[in-house]
């Protein structure tokens, strides 16, 4: 069977997706699978690369290059294709794409149109989980605790910034965290200690989206639970992000590597159980399939607040999701195999509906 590895993308998380894709390829059981590289560059070009029968030595090999004249260029080369050209039988797509145009339902909808099986959440789940404001509303209806928040539309802020500032300061206390509604990997997220910083933070968030979320900042640990499954949902013991920086931002996660992880987290057993229960409930409520990573805040009073549900978590060698499953006894290669089988099963079940 062929795995069509779809990676890269136009989002600011392009480079993260390449690192994740390399880790996935390195764990694939090539005795059973071939891997077809489909690279989406930063301009949105789809590039078909080689069919791999073994893992490349470095992630740089995945940054496919091509020559419009068709000449071979240095390194792995490919040719520009139309997106629909990826369709083929006896294949499953692994969309290792983070952020907008990757895990927000757009690619998932495209693959549904092509009638191809793929790994991960479906269209509705991807779209809702990617939208931080929509996720808040859904989880609030499910009774899952979250930190206080204020959604802010860009046009509202432009028309009457004082009203927005007053609303935020009347509902929340400083520090606040300001996030684009549709973005991941801490891209565009800023901490604000006063009104001036709040204004600058909103401007930063609006670089990425026309909707922003202002959240109450709290002194808390960051706890994460990995989820796996379709109808039968499994969860891991929680892990903890042990920060050496004040804010676990994009650079800390993927560039500076200034974070450490405690797996499993050193937390009371009852808190551990509650985190797993909330993770399963959130996953089920959002209609999850395949995989997700559910992130929580844990206060010194052992209060849990669900932060977000990530339908395509990072798969780099130091990413929390595969490490959490490794702690449960599921090796990286076996995890990839389970995800393939879950994707195939979901496709078969969808095809059986009238």
Over which residues does each language-model region extend?
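ATP-dependent carboxylate activation and anion-phosphoryl transfer catalytic cores
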Residues: 1, 7-9, 268-354
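ATP-binding N-terminal substructure of ATP-dependent carboxylate-amine bond-forming enzymes
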Residues: 1-119, 123-124, 128-130, 134, ...
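Active-site nucleotide/adenylate-binding loops and adjacent lid/helix of ATP-dependent enzymes
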Residues: 1-7, 11-12, 19-22, 26, ...
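Short, active-site-adjacent cap segments at secondary-structure transitions
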Residues: 43-48, 184, 221-224, 304
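A short acidic/small-residue loop/turn micro-motif
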Residues: 54, 241-243, 312-313
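Short small-residue beta-strand/loop micro-motif enriched in glycine and branched aliphatics
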Residues: 119-120, 186, 259-262, 317-321
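Phosphate-binding site of ATP-dependent enzymes
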Residues: 190-277, 298-305
């Amino acid at each position: 069977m062929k795995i069509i590895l779809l990676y890269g993308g136009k989002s600011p998380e392009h480079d993260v997706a390449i690192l994740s894709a390399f880790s996935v390829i390195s764990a694939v059981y090539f005795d059973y699978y071939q891997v077809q590289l489909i690279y989406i560059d930063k301009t949105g070009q789809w590039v078909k690369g080689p069919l791999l029968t073994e893992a490349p030595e470095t992630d740089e090999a995945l940054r496919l290059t091509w020559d419009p004249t068709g000449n071979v260029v240095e390194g792995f080369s490919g040719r520009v294709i139309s997106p629909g050209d990826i369709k083929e039988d006896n294949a499953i797509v692994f969309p290792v794409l983070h952020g907008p145009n990757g895990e927000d339902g757009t690619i998932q909808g495209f693959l549904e149109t092509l009638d191809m099986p793929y790994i991960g959440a479906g269209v509705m789940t991807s779209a809702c989980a990617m939208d931080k404001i929509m996720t808040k509303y859904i989880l609030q209806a499910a009774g899952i605790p979250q930190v206080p928040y204020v959604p802010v539309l860009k046009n509202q802020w432009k028309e009457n910034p004082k009203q927005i500032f007053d609303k935020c300061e009347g509902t929340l206390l400083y520090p606040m965290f300001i996030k684009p509604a549709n973005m991941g990997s801490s891209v565009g997220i800023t901490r604000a200690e006063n009104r001036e910083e709040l204004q600058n933070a909103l401007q930063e968030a609006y670089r990425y989206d026309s909707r922003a979320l202002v959240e109450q900042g709290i002194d808390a640990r960051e706890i994460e639970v990995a989820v796996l499954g379709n109808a039968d949902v499994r969860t891991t013991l929680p892990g903890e992000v042990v920060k050496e920086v004040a804010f676990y931002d994009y650079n800390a996660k993927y560039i500076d590597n200034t974070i450490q992880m405690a797996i499993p987290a050193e937390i009371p057993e009852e808190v551990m159980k509650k985190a797993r229960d909330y993770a399963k409930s959130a996953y089920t409520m959002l209609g999850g399939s395949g995989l997700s990573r559910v992130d929580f805040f844990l206060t010194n009073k052992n209060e849990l607040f669900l932060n977000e549900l990530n339908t395509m978590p990072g798969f780099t060698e130091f990413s929390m999701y595969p490490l959490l499953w490794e702690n449960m006894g599921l090796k990286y290669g076996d995890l990839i195999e389970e995800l393939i089988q879950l994707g195939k099963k979901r496709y078969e079940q969808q095809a059986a509906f009238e």
